[in-house]
């Protein structure tokens, strides 16, 4: 057996051959051999061939790798792996360096482009610059040399420049609205925002589009680019749920307070509504409140507070129809009802059992309020939990802080509304049981 040498691999020494202690014939017969060589005494007596075979050592096989060779092989493998890792890191660093150089190059190109655009726009207003300089003060002349440099915005803001210098047409976006200090002194009360003869704006109307169409343009104004369509630039549609909720709450107060004396109340007072009018008005109000709750703008804390107050007022009117006394005996009820035409939906509720029939009528209507209170309570609970994501308001600004009302106020409204409904239902049931 010869030893083989490879490049970089040490030579493997072949161990000497060791013969077995007994011959092959004695080993097969399991007899003790005299170990005489070349022929033992037993093989001589029997006349058989005596053959000594090589001894087979237990453990590693002949020609296996030695410990030093294995350690050398493992060392070479680890070195190759480390070289590959270093190559990967080097390639990653090269790619990152190229990306950073490309980003810096793009940044420089963008800066150069902005600088060129600024220098191109600066001399495009030769006529307006002297007028601006002349309006800054008496010491400045329009014929003074013009020095180009960074603009002084503080000076522009401090100087009394008239807006007419900018050649912008005077557009009246909201006709009849004068924002001077004199008008702010006599600012009207909130109920005057919604005149009784003016219809309530619907969701499909667009105030901005109408104002652009109706705004007058002076004849001597320079040519301006056409105003883009509001709906084409992605402006959110205007929603009128909040003024609609205010109108609903205002219409639930047809009778003026006895302690309130104003010129409008002295001129004439409206007659109290009938039972039929109260029932019809409450049904319509509940439908309107349901539509407002289903709208996305009901996430606003102010809107949901107003419709909750309207729901309280609906319960108060139902309590008045059912002849339920107010909470405080000293307070005067604002819900006055004309009970003379006591006919509701073809039923005559006049007579001795008028109170019982009115209570049954209100009890049959409370399922609408119960369904509304469930939806409203869920909406109020969502407001209190604050688990809704930030949304875009009608102005297009991220309205993540639109929960401006205290959480405990909304939570208290939800609890009180449910308690008021349960109290009214239990009082009506007790009255019907007493007969």
Swiss-Prot record:
One of its GO terms (molecular function) is DNA binding. Residues 130-147 have a biased composition (Low complexity). InterPro entries: AflR, OAF3, Zn2-C6_fun-type_DNA-bd_sf, Zn2Cys6_DnaBD. Coiled coil: none annotated. GO terms for biological process: aflatoxin biosynthetic process; monodictyphenone biosynthetic process; regulation of secondary metabolic process. The keyword Metal-binding applies. It is found in: Nucleus. Its main location: nucleus. Residues 117-147 are annotated as: Disordered. GO terms for cellular component: nucleus. Disruption phenotype: Impairs the production of monodictyphenone and of any of the intermediates of the pathway. The keyword Transcription applies. It comes from the Eukaryota. Keywords: DNA-binding, Metal-binding, Nucleus, Transcription, Transcription regulation, Zinc. Residues 23-50 bind DNA. Transcription factor that regulates the expression of the gene cluster that mediates the biosynthesis of monodictyphenone, a prenyl xanthone derivative. This is Monodictyphenone cluster transcription factor. It comes from Emericella nidulans (strain FGSC A4 / ATCC 38163 / CBS 112.46 / NRRL 194 / M139). The gene is mdpE.
């Amino acid at each position: 057996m010869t030893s083989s040498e490879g490049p970089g691999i040490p030579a493997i020494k072949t161990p000497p051959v060791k013969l077995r202690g007994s011959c092959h014939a004695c080993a097969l017969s399991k007899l003790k051999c005299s170990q005489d060589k070349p022929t033992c005494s037993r093989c001589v007596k029997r006349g058989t061939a005596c053959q000594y075979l090589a001894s087979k050592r237990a453990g590693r096989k002949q020609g296996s790798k030695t410990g030093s060779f294995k350690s050398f092989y493992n060392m070479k493998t680890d070195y190759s792996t480390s070289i590959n890792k270093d190559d990967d890191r080097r390639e990653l660093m090269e790619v990152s360096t190229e990306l950073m150089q490309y980003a810096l190059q793009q940044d420089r190109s963008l800066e150069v482009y902005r600088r060129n655009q600024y220098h191109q726009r600066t001399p495009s207003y030769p006529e307006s610059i002297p007028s601006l300089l002349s309006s800054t003060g008496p010491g400045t002349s329009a014929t003074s040399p013009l020095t180009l440099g960074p603009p002084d915005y503080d000076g522009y803001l401090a100087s009394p420049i008239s807006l007419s210098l900018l050649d912008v047409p005077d557009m009246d976006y909201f006709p009849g609205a004068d924002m001077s200090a004199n008008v702010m002194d006599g600012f009207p009360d909130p109920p005057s925002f919604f005149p009784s003869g003016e219809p309530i704006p619907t969701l499909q109307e667009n105030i901005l589009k109408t104002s652009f169409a109706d705004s007058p343009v002076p004849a001597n104004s320079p040519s301006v680019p056409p105003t883009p369509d509001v709906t084409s630039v992605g402006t959110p549609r205007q929603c009128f749920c909040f003024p609609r909720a205010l109108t609903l709450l205002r219409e639930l107060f047809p009778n003026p307070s006895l302690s309130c004396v104003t010129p409008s109340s002295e001129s004439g007072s409206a007659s109290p509504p009938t039972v039929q009018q109260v029932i019809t008005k409450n049904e319509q109000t509940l439908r309107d409140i349901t539509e407002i709750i289903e709208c996305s703008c009901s996430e606003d804390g102010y809107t949901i507070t107003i419709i909750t107050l309207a729901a309280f007022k609906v319960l108060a009117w139902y309590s008045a129809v059912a002849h339920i006394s107010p909470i405080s005996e000293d307070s005067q009820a604002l819900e006055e009802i004309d009970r003379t035409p006591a006919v509701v939906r073809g039923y005559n509720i006049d007579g001795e059992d008028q109170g019982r029939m009115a209570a049954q009528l209100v009890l049959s209507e409370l399922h609408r309020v119960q369904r509304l209170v469930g939806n409203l309570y869920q909406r109020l609970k969502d407001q209190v939990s604050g688990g809704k994501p930030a949304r875009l308001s009608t102005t297009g600004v991220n309205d993540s802080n639109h929960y401006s009302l205290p959480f405990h106020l909304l939570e208290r409204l939800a609890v009180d509304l449910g308690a008021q409904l349960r109290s009214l239902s239990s009082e009506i049931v007790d009255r019907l049981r007493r007969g």
